[in-house]
Amino acid sequence: MRDKIAGALFGMALGDAMGMPAELWGRKRVKAFFGRIEGFLDGPAENDVAFNYKKGQFTDDTGQALVLLDSIASTDYEPDTRDIALRMLAWAEKENAFENNILGPTSKVALANFRDNIQDSRITDKALSNGSAMRIAPIGCLFRPEQKEEIARYVYQVSRATHTSDVTIAGAAMIAEAVSSAMVKDDFDEVMEDVFGIEEIGYGMGCET
């Protein structure tokens, strides 16, 4: 199981780094520009986000996932929203994420509000972005796939600093469930059954959009 957890983390970082040059681009544009991406590449100057990165670098997806892991490890795996937000903000400032257009729209506003001591949950409650889902994969390593209620609840707890809407919690819970299931099951259809089995639970955890 330790090897599978390590594989999930390395796979996340390697896949992120390999996909980095195509950040935010649609399939058609990616195929026209790159043909096929079969190895690590520099972020192209034409990409408004990826131009910040060199080949082999992972993006904010993995960066935030590692911040999240650092936070929960420091609090004995009891999610602390303030600690997560503080660490996310410190990471963002270190990476110049606000200036370099690295943060997504929801995380950017939520973290800026936290920094400026502005209490306003509207941006997180109505979020339609994927900031929680993109960093959530490691959470799936902490649970067995049948623990769907526990997974969804934990996903909400570690996401609420930036995302609290039903659709974002459901999406993130499905990613975490996919990782949890794939670690113990080899059948793709069984994994997908688990993934869709947590969708409504995740929706029920978040604020209605």
Q: Across the structure, where does each feature detected by a protein language model lie?
A:
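Structured, active/binding-site neighborhoods that engage oxygen-rich ligands
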Residues: 1-209
